[in-house]
Curated annotation (Swiss-Prot):
Keywords, ordered alphabetically: Metal-binding, Ribonucleoprotein, Ribosomal protein, RNA-binding, rRNA-binding, Zinc, Zinc-finger
Cofactor(s) this protein cannot do without: Zn(2+)
Protein name per the record: Large ribosomal subunit protein eL37
A GO-annotated cellular component: cytosolic large ribosomal subunit
GO molecular function, one term: structural constituent of ribosome
Binding site for Zn(2+): 20, 23, 35, 38
GO biological process per UniProt: translation
Protein family (similarity comment): Belongs to the eukaryotic ribosomal protein eL37 family.
């Protein structure tokens, strides 16, 4: 068996994010259960002034 960088490629096969119920983007983290885009399941939507795409 090989240990080191070559065996680290096996970690990237599974999907980390799934589709969010609120915003519909593929940003809901499966293990953390939080959307990276809208902040679901928090009551307030995730919004920052330095993010330009929704202004």
């Amino acid at each position: 068996m090989v240990k080191g960088t070559t065996s680290m490629g096996g970690f990237t096969k599974k999907k980390v994010h799934i589709r969010c119920r609120r915003c519909g983007k593929n940003s809901l983290h499966k293990r953390h259960h939080q959307c990276a885009s809208c902040g679901f399941p928090e009551a307030k939507r995730r919004k920052y002034s330095w993010i330009k795409w929704y202004t």
